[in-house]
Regions:
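Short loop/turn and low-complexity linker motifs enriched in small/turn-promoting residues
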Residues: 1-189
Length: 189
């Protein structure tokens, strides 16, 4: 997710949304300016950046001086909560019949021949895979037993659910018709 719009004072501007762009240039008089991200959405947070603009030596080729301002943000706790909700929804569907046959469920529960299929613990939290990652993970434990003669008692099956935020072509969080984020949710790696 990136910041595509910002304001300085009463003026709002857009940045080039092309990921291959080397940036967008703006001209400012000398002074200290606060660049404030705008229109970041409900699930993304970004802090303002103060940047001094100095009068000074100019670039030989462009006859201008330049400074770089980087506006960065992060997914917020509200998105993490929505990711947890999506993880719990899939986990709960994986202990229903025929929901357990879904390819997004853990392989161990994808069977039509289970005499026991129970949820011992659903994810209670999710964590982001790393700074800037679009993926959250959570842990679940299922209790399963095959109806074959070999499996004499239920056993626990631990599984990791992966919740990946879907982004639109502009790099923004994709939202459904209710304004909620859209995720790709599945168990496994």
């Amino acid at each position: 997710e990136k910041v595509n719009r910002f304001s300085v004072g009463d003026v709002t501007s857009s940045l080039d949304g092309n990921k291959y762009s080397s940036g967008t240039s703006f001209v400012f008089y000398p002074g200290v300016y606060t660049f404030t991200p705008v229109d970041t959405g409900e699930y993304f947070s970004a802090d303002p950046v103060k940047q001094p603009v100095k009068a000074g030596a100019s670039d030989f080729l462009t006859n201008s001086s330049s400074a770089t301002v980087e506006l960065t943000g992060r997914y917020n706790d509200k998105l993490a909560q929505e990711a947890l909700n999506a993880a719990v929804d899939l986990t709960n569907s994986c202990v229903t019949i025929p929901g357990n046959i879904n390819k997004a469920c853990p392989y161990a529960v994808q069977s039509k021949h289970l005499s026991v299929l129970e949820l011992k613990s659903a994810p209670t939290s999710v964590k982001q895979d790393g700074p800037g990652s679009d993926t959250y993970t959570g842990e679940a434990v299922f209790s399963i037993q095959s109806d074959s003669g070999f499996d004499k008692s239920p056993h626990d099956e631990e599984a990791t659910v992966r919740v990946t935020v879907k982004l639109d072509s502009d790099g923004k969080i994709q939202l459904d018709s209710a304004g909620k984020p859209v995720f790709d949710v599945k168990f496994g790696f």
